């Protein structure tokens, strides 16, 4: 059997390494992939958003099954096009991917179906948004670009001045292009934030192990928002009682709502949750595996991943019993200095073996290149150092211990991943 995984980051590397455990898979292709993924799959340099050439590649390679994970190709209809060519896929069609590609759609969906979330207002005019801010006068307040912005289109304003600046940045300067044509301004929620990825075939919802993402670039929750600087799983805040509440009030109602709207969702649905004093509420939806959440969730999966993905595609998820390791996992991201703003590429990475690994942990490659027998930095987030152990403390300790063996110029990482829940 031949599998195509579309994407080029640490998340795709984690999916590929998990798929490799299945002996019926003869070959895994990753497009475009990266230097480290090349040790585990055949990488072919076709952009994830080049729909025509990706379909051509899938047909030429006679691919049996395709996994589409990045948000852009999902929103553009990659799954629709591949399936029209008779290639079964894991991932939602464009009609359902709107749950992530439009924050306005997601907020309106939650309002209509009474799914708990923050109070909000939608604006397509900058001056109206500024007038609203001045009238409401509530801080902190959250401003979100409607469209996809690489996980960076959310701004938290502490003052009126910052809020007005955020509106101008999103709507006038168009920092994220068309993504900021409309914006959502919403109330600031408090409480621990938890990520729950879930498999769904449009009928049944099977949540994965919970995780906690650390989004800020610097220690002590400071610095700019990033795609994620580290993760732990499971979240100690996410109790069985909270999980049951989420299933009843959020997970099932969301999947049911999408069905009612004529947008049945099949794939991995990511729930970004805030455990507020009033109960769990939705911060955001993603229509795909999170990054770097995937790098801590999939290492704990016992059931074969391809079997699950095919059951999702065939709408037979109810027939599966999905099992997880009773362990903990931590992943610390090693980033290029300057990320998420300007950074240099092309620095040699030392400390990795020929397969891009370090003994005792799993290294997931996000932004790396392989050239003349050496690994080089090639992105903002470069590597994820992921460790599995019996406790979170041990997993974090192991990750940080092994980071000492890896070096590249201007290497940056947060030293306090998991500190909120673990006394290190």
Where are these regions (language model features)?
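Internal nucleotide-binding/catalytic subdomain
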Residues: 154-294
């Amino acid at each position: 059997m031949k599998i195509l995984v579309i994407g080029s980051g640490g998340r795709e590397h984690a999916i590929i390494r998990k798929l490799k455990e299945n002996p019926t898979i003869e070959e895994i292709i990753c497009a475009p992939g990266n230097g480290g993924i090349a040790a585990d799959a055949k990488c072919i340099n076709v952009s994830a958003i080049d729909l025509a050439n990706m379909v051509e590649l899938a047909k030429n390679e006679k691919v049996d099954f395709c996994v589409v994970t990045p948000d852009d190709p999902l929103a553009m209809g990659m799954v629709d096009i591949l399936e029209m060519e008779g290639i079964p896929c894991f991932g939602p069609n464009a009609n359902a991917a709107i749950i992530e590609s439009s924050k306005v759609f997601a907020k309106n969906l939650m309002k209509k179906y009474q799914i708990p979330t923050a109070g909000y207002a939608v604006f397509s005019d900058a001056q109206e948004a500024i007038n609203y801010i001045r009238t409401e006068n509530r801080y902190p307040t959250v401003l979100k670009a409607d469209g996809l912005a690489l996980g960076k289109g959310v701004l938290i304003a502490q003052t009126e001045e910052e809020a007005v600046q955020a509106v101008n940045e999103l709507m006038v300067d168009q920092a994220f292009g068309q993504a900021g044509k409309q914006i959502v301004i919403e109330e600031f929620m408090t409480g621990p934030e938890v990520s729950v990825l879930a498999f769904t075939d449009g009928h049944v919802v099977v949540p994965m192990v919970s995780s906690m993402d650390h989004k800020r670039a610097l220690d002590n929750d400071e610095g700019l928002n990033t795609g994620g600087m580290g993760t732990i799983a499971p979240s100690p805040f996410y109790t069985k009682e909270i999980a049951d509440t989420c299933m009843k009030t959020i997970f099932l109602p969301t999947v049911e709502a999408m069905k009612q709207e004529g947008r049945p969702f099949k794939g991995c649905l990511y729930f970004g949750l805030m455990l507020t004093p009033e109960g769990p509420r939705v911060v955001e939806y993603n229509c795909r595996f999170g990054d770097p959440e995937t790098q801590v969730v999939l290492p704990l999966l016992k059931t074969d991943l391809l079997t699950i993905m095919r059951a999702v595609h065939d709408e037979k998820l109810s027939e599966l019993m999905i099992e997880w390791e009773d362990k903990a996992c931590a992943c610390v991201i090693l980033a290029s200095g300057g990320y998420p703003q300007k950074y240099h590429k092309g620095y040699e990475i030392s400390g990795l073996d020929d397969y891009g690994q370090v003994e005792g942990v799993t290294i997931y490659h996000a932004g790396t290149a392989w050239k003349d027998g050496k690994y080089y930095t090639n992105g903002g987030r470069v590597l994820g150092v992921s460790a599995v152990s019996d406790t979170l403390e041990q997993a974090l300790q192991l990750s940080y211990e092994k980071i000492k063996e890896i070096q590249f110029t201007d290497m940056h990482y947060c030293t306090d991943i998991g500190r909120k829940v673990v006394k290190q």
